[in-house]
Amino acid sequence: MSDLVKELLKTVDNSLSVEGANVKVLDAAKFRKNICKLVECSALASDSTAGWSRYLIRSAALELGVIPASIHELYLARGRGEAPMTFTVPAFNLRALSYHAARAMFRSAKKINAGAFIFEIARSEIGYTGQRPAEYATNILAAAISEGFVGPVFIQGDHFQISAKKYMADPQAELQTVRDLSIESIGAGFFNIDVDTSTLVDINLPTVPEQQKLNCELSAQLSAFIREHEPQGVTISIGGEIGEVGTNNSTEPELRAYMDGYNVEMKKLAHGMPGLSKISVLTGTSHGGTVLADGSLAKVTIAFDVLRDLSRVARKEYGMGGTVQHGASTVAEENFNKFVQNEAIEVHLATNFMTMFFDNIPADFKKEMYAWLDVNSAGDRKPGMTDEQFYYKARKNAIGPFKAKSYALPEAELAKLGAAWEAQFDKLFNLLGMKDTKQVVDQFITTVKVAPKLSNYVKDAVESEDVSDLSD
């Protein structure tokens, strides 16, 4: 055993043992108490210390019944009419202090026996939050261990998106970047991946099938690639998307054109293999919302009937779980139960939890982050922008550079932030029908203990990429 590993075991009071690549939990209570030290090593170290910390947590999680899982079977059960229509699965993008936020989420879940919820991170967020997939998954699994949660944990790659600009410059290089990210994520325990090639939809073409052609073909190519690399016994939940967030609402002809084209391509590339479990559609939202001059957000009007009508087509015609709503953090809370009423299978939430981070951190720390943005994100300041609009749009860029200082916040400040997040999770879980969904998860989800590969964790660091044109 290397000195490095011995030192890491000391940080958790020797509650784990390591022989070669085999990890055993010797004292679960002691490990739970000290796991936060490994989390900090995972997040802040830049060498093999980070890799080993992640590997130890992933391995211990399996032994403690915290199992990365795919939600595919549950979604297909909804498509068959076997799973109840009483809930919409929330998918949370935890950008800042992900471990602390996930702990709050697991606390909320345990109060009401919830199990059907997802932790996700987008390709763009991996860049500006400074969290590679293995680090993000480590934060989530460690949070589950800390809070005594047992069962399937759904970790998702959100918007594994093709950059239209980069694709036009070099199609194969851009596709390979998403393939590589998929491989990296699967190795880290991401068994749910949202493939997003909707950036390549061309609405200037004369017919809907022509507009969606490149989207469905590339979605199928990436899906076939994921199927080829998914672990034995695991069917990764793959989501597709028929349009980027923002402009015109999605239509049934678009959904049918995309799915029909996708299914034709999948038969060629991966005959007999499962396809999509869900589909993301446009209903009038935008990522992050529209910020007004005073820093407040414009009210969002969602076409809930689009979610309902297209969910029904997705289930009845294509066997999927239904439609997915992106950019929902800025939707009025009183409307959240409408996602359930209108049969959405999944809803994505990110911005509000980042807003709560900035609203709850000490004023001096926030001022320091904003001063950094003045210098390092000056290019994001558009003519006519107020300070409030600029900071709202640019502040996410400070999360990665200030990660270490975020971890170093006093315990009282971290507790205050955790309590605020927990109260919000409580509210959203109630509105989205999460009570007793652990029973539904246990009924339909098959868990497979996929042993992590040490070589996926202890290797050269992956350089960050320019993701400024990608969606969150």
Regions found by a protein language model. Name each.
Residues R103-A116, A134-T138, A142-E147, A169-Y318:
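Alpha/beta enzyme core
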